[in-house]
Design a protein with these regions (language model features):
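Bacterial extracytoplasmic/cell-wall-associated proteins, especially those involved in peptidoglycan
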Residues: 31-36, 52-217
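Short, glycine-/polar-rich solvent-exposed loops and beta-turns at beta-strand/coil boundaries
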Residues: 43-46
Length: 217
């Protein structure tokens, strides 16, 4: 059962674009490939595990634990911690074991790339680097990653608000390509129109390319 989930920019939850398609999220994709004789893991079971299991037990990196725990019981709190890539899943595994497997492998990948030193070199924590790279993924049409990375670093430096539509949409059920003034004014943990600095968590799974763009914009 191949979980070829993950492209950079994948999100945990499904995204409904107003008047358009649904972009299926990681939870839905896992549910789909976990089916065994008609038994599938439910998306809700995966969400419950993500929201309620100690992130350290799921294999989350040490440098992300504080930020994850601050989000309380939000099933989106592990956003960005499943790295893009191809995974082979055992359909007999429980929801907890599947998430643990995916997150543990991703943590290993992130740590093997020296993410802590790389983040430090540009004045960010590893978690902030992941978060910034996720913005690069969601904001950069057609991979203009460097441009967005420069904007992020310049605005954080100023400091001025990032004001990215992707961070407004991340808090909404139904996504509009152009965000409304009302949505921009609403305080959420992610909305960079209404808050200073970066969102509280990544808003997608960042690819290696997006992370590299943050390092060398």
């Amino acid at each position: 059962h191949n979980l070829d989930v993950l492209q950079g920019g994948a999100t945990l939850e499904d995204v409904k674009v107003v008047g358009g398609d649904v972009r299926y999220g990681i939870y839905s994709l896992i549910s789909e490939v976990s089916c065994n004789d008609g038994n599938c893991l439910k998306k809700e079971d995966l969400e419950k595990v993500a929201a309620e299991t100690d992130p350290a037990e799921l294999g989350a990196p040490e440098w992300a634990l504080d930020a994850i725990n601050k989000r309380g019981n939000d099933p989106k709190r592990i956003e960005g911690l499943i790295a893009p890539g191809q995974y082979v899943l055992d359909p007999n595994m429980e929801a907890k074991d599947i998430l643990k497997d995916l997150i543990t492998r991703s943590t290993k990948r992130y740590n093997e790339t020296n993410i802590e030193e790389r983040a430090q070199a540009i004045g960010l924590s590893p978690y902030e680097l992941l978060t910034s790279a996720s913005l690069v993924e969601r904001e950069a049409p057609a991979g203009e990653f460097d441009k967005v990375a420069r904007v992020i670093l310049n605005r954080l430096d100023e400091p001025m608000r990032l004001e990215f539509d992707s961070t407004v949409n991340y808090g909404l059920e139904d996504v509009e390509l152009a965000t409304t003034d009302e949505a921009r004014g609403e305080k959420t943990p992610w909305n960079t129109y209404a808050k200073e600095g970066l969102p509280d968590t990544p808003i997608a799974s960042p690819s290696d390319d997006a992370i590299k763009a943050m390092e060398q914009p």
